[in-house]
UniProtKB/Swiss-Prot annotation:
Main localization, broad class: membrane
Keywords: ATP-binding, Cell membrane, Membrane, Nucleotide-binding, Translocase, Transport
Similarity annotation: Belongs to the ABC transporter superfamily. Energy-coupling factor EcfA family.
Taxonomic lineage: Bacteria, Bacillati, Bacillota, Clostridia, Eubacteriales
Function field: ATP-binding (A) component of a common energy-coupling factor (ECF) ABC-transporter complex. Unlike classic ABC transporters this ECF transporter provides the energy necessary to transport a number of different substrates.
Domain ABC transporter: 6-248
Enzyme Commission no: 7.-.-.-
Membrane topology of the entry: Peripheral membrane protein
Gene name of this polypeptide: ecfA1
Quaternary context: Forms a stable energy-coupling factor (ECF) transporter complex composed of 2 membrane-embedded substrate-binding proteins (S component), 2 ATP-binding proteins (A component) and 2 transmembrane proteins (T component).
This protein's name: Energy-coupling factor transporter ATP-binding protein EcfA1
Assigned GO CC terms: ATP-binding cassette (ABC) transporter complex
GO BP term, pick one: cobalt ion transport
Subcellular location: Cell membrane
Gene3D superfamilies attached to this UniProt entry: P-loop containing nucleotide triphosphate hydrolases
Amino acid sequence: MTNPYIVAEGVSYAYGREEADGAAPVRLALDGVDLDVRRGEFLAILGMNGSGKSTLARHLNALLLPRAGRVLVDGLDTREEANLWSIRDRVGMVFQNPDNQIVAAVVEEDVAFGPENQGLPSAEIRARVAEALEAVGMSEHRERSPHLLSGGQKQRVAIAGALAMRPACLVLDEPTAMLDPSGRAEVLAVVRRLNRELGMTVVWITHFMDEAVVADRVVVMAEGRVQMVGTPREVFAQADRIRALRLDLPPAVQAAERLRAQGVPLPRTILTLDELVEALCQLYSRP
């Protein structure tokens, strides 16, 4: 997975505008961001509120355009107006609140909204809707009202709506922030399967450290800049730096740290609860 699908080069973005007298009531949200999203990978982007991660997400399918630098999606420059529809066909977006993306009174009609606006034939639309609902495990709910679904189910409908557009890449901006733990697990499992089984490129924006553990790579942002990039194991092994960026460590990493502080000789490479349990079992099953 070394072939970049999306490339950000020196991307800067500010909210607001400069005043005529030279005063600049602007907030720099991105400051010279360089990033590549590799074809077929699951990339997690972490950061505190205000770190720039959501602003960056909106640059990946040209919802926002850089004030400086450029973003290339499958070789297409997002600054070129002629490329916008092609880019948005390639990169689907899912946002934090699924209610803001639901536009129809019936699940299958909501999923069909995008393909209908592409002017596709009815048979093609039906096939895409069926395929997308099957992919997120929502086929049996196709005739229900979205507003009667749980939060996790609504988010799966929003993901199906994006999938019906047949994107090569899915960008999800804190898709589990408004969900309970079971809803979070449900949505993450669906997206992991899309990545692993269908090869879909995934960019997952989150502030939940345990979600980032399943990614191929992790990007940590602060103050509009990329601060760290690496595998989850590489990034979370740098506990002091993570804390300096005012982020938490994954639960298993925290637990292993506390046990080591009590004298339990655990390896520093532990990342998941399963790994922690296995290490403890090996340690205490020795004769």
